[in-house]
Amino acid sequence: MVRKMQMFADGRSRKVVFLAHCLLNQNAISDGTAEVPAAHREILRTVLDARVGVVQLPCPELCCLGLDRGDPKGGERPVVAENTRIRRAMGQPEASARLRELTDQVVWQIREYQKHGFAVLGIVGVDRSPCCGVNTTSDQDRELPGRGVFIASLRAALESAGLTVPVIGIKPSAPEALDRVRPLLGE
């Protein structure tokens, strides 16, 4: 009789959380909006201290529009005005097609983790973002209730694939940000 070895029975926790790209890399964020030099340390530390692996979501704005978001003067505008411009640019055919590809890649990763018995604890987006907002987004030159275009696409794709994953939005520098992340981690 041959015994089959269980895969991934090593030191890993078999738990992951998907974090918005800019939480781990502020260098990717739109001009004029970075709050810290590199990454939001407290969020990352909280996740790692809970022994949860981190999967960095792609930055849809960077991947679809480039680092300057298609306008080198974007940082001169008020944040919500620039975010509204970015949101509109994400609706253009080329950006929309690329956004669907990014969404499909994330859904594939989630399915792959779940297929192998990993717990996908959740997805953490960034509120006010035109792409990664969960509770609020930017449109009409202001912050409004609603989802960013990437999170909306991702939630629809997850539902279509029959995958259930909690999705929360935070404002990383807000005092309550860690309190919103901790329940995902089982704390």
Which stretches of residues belong to each language-model region?
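Active-site-proximal loop/turn and secondary-structure-junction residues that shape catalytic pockets
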Residues: 23, 60-63, 129-131, 171-174
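A structural signal for short, well-ordered beta-strand segments and their strand-loop junctions
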Residues: 18, 54-58, 122-126, 166-171
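Short catalytic/ligand-binding loop motif for oxyanion handling, primarily in non-cytosolic enzymes
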Residues: 27, 64-66, 131-135, 176-178
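Short coil/turn segments at beta-strand junctions that form active-site/ligand-binding loops
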Residues: 13-15, 52, 118-121
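Short, surface-exposed acidic-centric catalytic microdomains
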Residues: 37-89
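Residues lining hydrophobic/aromatic ligand-binding pockets adjacent to catalytic sites
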Residues: 2-16, 25-40, 44, 58, ...
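Internal, conserved structured core segments that host functional sites
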Residues: 119-138
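Divalent-metal-activated hydrolytic enzyme cores
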Residues: 3-7, 11-13, 38, 80-115, ...
